[in-house]
Amino acid sequence: MSDYKFTLNLPETEFPMRGNLANREPEMLERWTKDGLYQQIRDSRIGRTPFILHDGPPYANGSIHIGHSVNKILKDIIVKSKTMSGFDAPYVPGWDCHGLPIELKVEQKVGKPGQKISAAEFREECRKYAAEQVDGQRADFIRLGVLGDWQKPYLTMDFATEANIVRSLSKVIENGHLHKGVKPVHWCTDCGSALAEAEVEYEDKTSPAIDVAFTATDSKAVAAQFGVSDYSHPVAMVIWTTTPWTLPANRALSISPELDYSLVEFAKEGATHAVILADVLVEACMTRYGAESHNVLGKVKGAALELVRFKHPFLAFDVPAILGDHVTTDAGTGVVHTAPGHGQDDFVVGQKYGLEVANPVGDNGVYKPDTEFFAGQHVFKANDNVVALLKEKGALLHHVAYRHSYPHCWRHKTPIIFRATPQWFISMDNQNLRKQALSEIEQTQWIPDWGQSRIEKMVENRPDWCISRQRTWGVPITLFVHRETEELHPDSVSLMARVANRIEQEGIQAWWDLDAAELLGEEAEQYRKVTDTLDVWYDSGSTFASVVGARPEFHGHGVDLYLEGSDQHRGWFMSSLMISTAMTGKAPYKQVLTHGFTVDGKGRKMSKSIGNVIAPQQVTNKLGADILRLWVAATDYSGEMTVSDEILNRSADAYRRIRNTARFLLANLNGFDPAKDLVAVEDMVALDRWAVRRAAALQQEIIEAYEQYNFHIVTQKLMQFCSVELGSFYLDIIKDRQYTAKQEGHARRSCQSALFHIAEAMVRWIAPILSFTADEVWQLLPGQRNAYVFTQEWYQDLQSITLDTDLSDAYWENLLTVRNEVNKVIEQARRDKRIGGSLEAEVTLFADAALTEQLTHIGDELRFVLLTSEAKVLPLADATSDAVETELASLKLVVNATTAEKCERCWHHREEVGKIEAHPTLCHRCVTNIEGDGEVRLFA
């Protein structure tokens, strides 16, 4: 064999079998940075149609987690695939840099502003801290292979962005959407600030659930309304609440106008009580109160009790019964304790009746000094004291510890309160913002489509947006209000423009350093500067204007796509929609795509306490970023995304199949120069033409899947192609031709041309997902080419040609089915030790007329398809008794060990081996390939 092995076309490539991604990827990143790859991509798309994916900014605090990785990788796949489709798709990553979490971190280092450090110095420390966090996260995102303008990302703390945020607020004000009001807002007593809806989490909490009697000011008159005359016992209306601490702020009792209410007399421990309850809840209440007996004295509709007055159980005033649509009979008594300063529904119904918005609670959750009974007590600690006082006053009918879902601060994980405070709001209804936003939601494509109904419900039910915060590190609400009337300065919009210009030069500190007289002149003494800062959701929510609308690479083109986790319907998607609609009357996006959260193999959230956290840094250091990227792409992101070490190892296995396919392609393109060796598709061997045709069809399917953001379908089709159509069929068949045919002959060059087309296409298919591997393949492909695959478009030379004389795709699919049946019988013969490899087999196929016509069409080349040394086709009717039945009714098989000698060069067993005098160890085919013009292949 030593004489002939040099006549073989052995595969050869520098592309290693093992990716060694963890070590090699950083080297590639270094080259990408050095070569200015992102700018090369930008330059390659000048003048093309823009596609703008706007990056929702992660918060600049802490290391990135697996959820961040999912988000950034999905965005990167989209941007790269859109670029491959010819779009100008810039990607400018961003960070959210203001707000409480950064303040808390800085407080731990330097203390609270105004104590050991001035507010100005504190802001500067916050800016430094945020910049450090951005640097850390940026390095981790780059390591994932995400391409973008990492040198010039947008930061909400950039002076220009801070200024543009102020400018966007001035437009909201100009359009009449801002108002100031005393309203109940989510309030964290630990933060000392209002919270946005998106900053509220719900956790279980145990609270005292109490039934409290409010005695009528005129019991006899109330009883008469129920048809009971001259009633002698006190009559009380009963409320049920889980927030006893709000009772000092009670100003009414809400009932439903349509519900039936009963006057119930019941006996307990020798005393007679008369109470008003919703009729459907009477039995449940009597059981709860431990009534020994009870009797319904009369019923009326709730509407009949409107404005009847009842005494507050421990304060010296009385309150009215009022009608409210928010009253239900799901629990309690059918009567709702109403404190307009401590609840949204309470506030709304209170406005209708002109009730006082009482707020006896300070910023720190402690009752104010003038609060009777409870001054100086923290509200949650006062609950027990309220209960004790009610008991003392004889107003407590029942008391039990009650476990329920309760709002908590997302940062402190502590229970929050509803508290009326003077705040700045964007009104949902004054200028029809709610109606406009709902209309815009309908014009937007939501992926998955359930996102539309989700955000619609949120917009329909959301209160006015409280955009003010009482914090130090944030974009200031740059307003001047009159010291006496609290009215905005009439020139607020133009004043804000002047302030924004200063902030653009000096940052937000310019507002606090500003002497009002510089802008207001003699009016300065009549006005005061607002010291509140903006909700950070306003910062990020306005970036469609402050960033996309301002940076030159976006060309003034609107945003095409927002892509974030499914929690952002109430977060970034919502705030962006509100601000954009308030500013322009339009949504800021055309499409909104959401992905699910990451969970472990058992469906649990990632938690340090459970010990199931998968850190992206560990994955890239161990397996490589391309494995993480493949897992993201292969997972259906519309639901929860399951990740574990086992799942990532499965992704690594899948990756190896793709890598091995790429390696086979490259190794067999050794010595191929497309400039002179490329065979035209119409001149190819039929099987090669089929392979190119299949690749062309697959490319259309892959492009369509990318366009629809169905990346898991891309990976499924890619794996199917690599494993089945290529790996188990085409590549398996062509190995013999590739290795043994004449090096420059048509049979081999046809095959190499097909491999070249497939490799050129496939490197582009995988580039958005397996970016590092695609770059590695691209550098080793033969022929003249640009430096990077990422500047290319989808491969255009996959000509899907079918000649009149060609065998159809269905023909090759049938042949693949036959081949699989033959393989089963050969495998059994190997297990029976009748043969070694398949080339030691002679196979006889007994086939019906239709199948015989197909199998004989390619003549002697059938043996190359079946990977046997001999293949004979005989009529099915002639099947011998030892013929094996197959899953095809039209086919039976016999496999025998060949008696022919083995060709030393190609290992086929042929009768002529030993009969050729010049080459006694070779077959005719090999002699032709080393001395003649090379074998002729037409079909396979």
Swiss-Prot record:
Motif residue range(s): 'HIGH' region: 58-68
Localization per record: Cytoplasm
Cofactor requirement: Zn(2+)
Listed transmembrane segments: none
Record-linked InterPro entries: aa-tRNA-synth_I_CS, aa-tRNA-synth_Ia, Anticodon_Ile_BEm, Ile-tRNA-ligase, Ile-tRNA-ligase_type1, Ile-tRNA_ligase, M/V/L/I-tRNA-synth_anticd-bd, Rossmann-like_a/b/a_fold
Entry binding sites for ATP: K608
Locus of motif 'KMSKS' region: 605-609
Entry EC no(s): 6.1.1.5
Keyword hit for Zinc: yes
GO MF assignments: aminoacyl-tRNA deacylase activity; ATP binding; isoleucine-tRNA ligase activity; tRNA binding; zinc ion binding
Statement: the UniProt record of this protein carries the keyword Zinc: yes
Keyword vocabulary terms for this entry: Aminoacyl-tRNA synthetase, ATP-binding, Cytoplasm, Ligase, Metal-binding, Nucleotide-binding, Protein biosynthesis, Zinc
Binding site for L-isoleucyl-5'-AMP: E564
Annotated residues for binding of Zn(2+): C903, C906, C923, C926
Subunit record text: Monomer.
Domain notes: IleRS has two distinct active sites: one for aminoacylation and one for editing. The misactivated valine is translocated from the active site to the editing site, which sterically excludes the correctly activated isoleucine. The single editing site contains two valyl binding pockets, one specific for each substrate (Val-AMP or Val-tRNA(Ile)).
Purpose: Catalyzes the attachment of isoleucine to tRNA(Ile). As IleRS can inadvertently accommodate and process structurally similar amino acids such as valine, to avoid such errors it has two additional distinct tRNA(Ile)-dependent editing activities. One activity is designated as 'pretransfer' editing and involves the hydrolysis of activated Val-AMP. The other activity is designated 'posttransfer' editing and involves deacylation of mischarged Val-tRNA(Ile).
Record protein name field: Isoleucine--tRNA ligase
Gene: ileS
